[in-house]
Swiss-Prot record:
Protein name as it appears in the record: Glutaredoxin-3
Domain Thioredoxin, first and last residues per copy: 2-119
Keyword list, A-Z: Acetylation, Cytoplasm, Iron, Iron-sulfur, Metal-binding, Phosphoprotein, Repeat
Protein source organism: Mus musculus (Mouse)
Phenotype upon gene inactivation: Homozygous null mutants die in utero some time between 12.5 and 14.5 dpc. 12.5 dpc embryos have a smaller body size and hemorrhage in the head. Heterozygous mutants are fertile and show no abnormalities in growth and development, cardiomyocytes exhibit significantly reduced contractility.
UniProt xrefs under CDD domains: GRX_PICOT_like, TRX_PICOT
UniProt modified residues of type Phosphoserine: S119
UniProt superkingdom: Eukaryota
Keyword Nucleus among record annotations: no
NCBIfam families linked: Grx4 family monothiol glutaredoxin
Quaternary structure annotation from Swiss-Prot or TrEMBL: Homodimer; the homodimer is independent of 2Fe-2S clusters. Heterotrimer; forms a heterotrimeric complex composed by two BOLA2 molecules and one GLRX3 molecule; linked by [2Fe-2S] clusters. Interacts (via N-terminus) with PRKCQ/PKC-theta. Interacts (via C-terminus) with CSRP3. Interacts with CSRP2.
Modified residues annotated as N-acetylalanine in this record: A2
Binding-site positions, [2Fe-2S] cluster: C161, C263
One GO CC term on file: cell cortex
Length: 337
């Protein structure tokens, strides 16, 4: 009994509750050396209560990470500052800067994000020479993380300097497919990359791990029409939709995901699919407006959810219900019909 009480006490302390904007800002200042994960929650939402339990478990696994819960409606100034429009929402901070965000009750995704940020910022204690070697290997991996990598201040959605914003605009204008790294999220990378590539400023653009240059060089390449030949193009929407509809044998395009449907029709179709025992994957159309609108034309089907088997449209909820009632759904899902 005493041991159980002690364990409960440890779990309770592991997640800190913040009740004011001042307390939150103070916590950001104090926790600059560690990852800070903040859960914007509401006591009336059962999914938030569940995610608090998930946070408590993660806190046990990651004692060096600071986990915080903040009641969104009780501290509106913080919620408004970070554009919290629904609960649960999780924000990730490093060096007092927001580096990531997760909307919704997605326990596996929360766990993945925590693990990723912990590993990206952690270096084993070692000698200076080993640290330099480790950093060099890490920078090599980062510059090769995608065919085209942009190291910038902020993110493509929220650039935090004019040069980074201009760079993103040029890449988007030329339909260039790229991934990005926010140098504000990692001071070691920010300083190390300057030496690694012998380039003192940001943003920096890499293709196949090789430095192309900063904004001025990219502007020159754009003017000479060389940029399109150097950087990889993003796939056209139709090609992207073909890939998405064939991503799994059974693909459901819906509002929300398996864990949390965000409309009644999507919830009903999930229940039907779950009852079949057939494996399937989902795509949340609320997270990608281009896919949401494009798929309507691509398949000539104006509403959601939409179910695909091996890339072919089966239909929406009404058709899936009919197929189930006729005993035809399972053979179709298994590719037998």
């Amino acid at each position: 009994m005493a041991a159980g009480a002690a364990e409960a006490g440890e779990a309770a302390v592991a997640v800190v509750e913040v009740g004011s904007a001042q307390q939150f800002e103070e916590l950001l200042r104090l926790k600059t050396k560690s990852l800070l994960v903040v859960h914007f929650w509401a006591p009336w939402a059962p999914q938030c209560v569940q995610m608090n339990d998930v946070m408590a478990e993660l806190a046990k696994e990651h004692p060096h990470v600071s986990f915080v819960k903040l009641e969104a409606e009780a501290v509106p100034e913080v919620s408004e500052k970070y554009e919290i429009s629904s609960v649960p929402t999780f924000l990730f901070f490093k060096n007092s800067q927001k580096v990531d965000r997760l909307d919704g009750a997605h326990a596996p995704e929360l766990t993945k994000k925590v693990q990723r940020h912990v590993s990206s910022g952690a270096f084993p204690p070692s000698t200076n020479e080993h640290l330099k070697e480790d950093l060099s290997l890490r920078l090599k991996k980062l510059t090769h993380a995608a065919p085209c990598m942009l190291f910038m201040k902020g993110t493509p959605q929220e650039p935090r300097c004019g040069f980074s914003k201009q760079m993103v605009e040029i890449l988007h204008k030329h339909n260039i497919q790229f991934s990005s790294f926010d140098i504000f999220s990692d001071e070691e990378v920010r300083q190390g990359l300057k030496t690694y590539s012998n380039w003192p400023t940001y943003p920096q653009l890499y293709v196949s791990g090789e430095l192309i240059g900063g904004l001025d060089i990219i502007k020159e390449l754009e003017a000479s029409e060389e940029l399109d030949t150097i950087c990889p193009k993003a796939p056209k929407l139709e090609e992207r939709l073909k890939v998405l509809t064939n991503k799994a044998s059974v693909m459901l395009f819906m509002k929300g995901n398996k864990q949390e449907a965000k409309c009644g029709f999507s919830k009903q179709i999930l229940e039907i699919l779950n009852s079949t025992g057939v494996e399937y994957e989902t795509f949340d159309i609320l997270e990608d407006e281009e896919v949401r609108q494009g798929l309507k034309t691509f398949s000539n089907w104006p509403t959601y959810p939409q179910l695909y088997v091996r890339g072919d449209l089966v239909g929406g909820l009404d058709i899936v219900k009919e197929l189930k009632d006729n005993g035809e759904l399972l053979p179709i899902l298994k590719g037998e019909n």
